[in-house]
Amino acid sequence: MKKLAIALVVLAAPGVAAASGTTLHLTEKQTFQQYVDNGAKGESAGDIRTFGGDVFQSGKRVGHDRIRCVVGATCNSQVWIGRSSLIANGFVAKGPSFTAKITGGTGKYKGARGTVSVVGVPTTKYTVRLVG
């Protein structure tokens, strides 16, 4: 299974309950991946990749994630940490790396803004920084 490194930088909007200046170091163990090869054979625009897994902090499971990418178009992701989540969306070109905008969240991340950078590597790592 392909693995990704993800760095989340979150700007806390007014009313966001999570403390600004907080940094969370998370890792993901991918539990599923599905690939739909649309159009031209092999990876090409319009193909759909869906994957997700369990999210850990200091070796303890704290949540899960789900990511759906359309090659050459958009990538939509949601990372749940406890009862709260972060939502990110953005353009993803062919290849393992992209940057997306954090467009909101739920619970203590409600109103969150920032960016998420994704780079393909052997393991998935999340770094969440709350600033504001």
Give residue spans per PLM region.
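Sec-dependent N-terminal signal peptides
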Residues: 4-13
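Beta-strand-enriched cores of mature, soluble protein domains
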Residues: 20-132
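Bacterial Sec-dependent signal peptides at the C-terminal "C-region" and cleavage site
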Residues: 12-22
